[in-house]
C-alpha cells in the first residue's frame, strides 16, 4: 500500500470512529420507545450507518483481507438495506445494529487504526 493509500485508509478509519461516536451521542439516554418515536434521531442514525457502510466499501481490499474476521460485507449490507428501503427504516433492525453491532465494531476499528498508524510510522520513505 502506498503512503497516500495508507494515509487515506487511516483517515477513513478515523471517520468511521467519529461516526460511531456521533451515533453514541445521538442515542444517549434513549430507550427503544424514545428512539422509535424520534424521527430525527432515527434518520440521523440511519444516515450514520450508511456513511460507515460507504466508507467500508471503499477501504482497500488488502486491509479487508488482513482483517478478514471483521464482517465487512455485513456492514456494507446494512448500508444497502437502509439506502434501498425507500419506505422508511426498519426501526427494530437499526436499533439492533446500534446496540449490538456498533458497540462491537468500535474497538475493532480502534485496534485496526492503531495497527495501521503503527505500520505507517515504520514504513520506509518512497
Task: For each feature predicted by the language model, list its residue ranges.
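Solvent-exposed interaction patches of small proteins and small membrane subunits
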Residues: 1-126
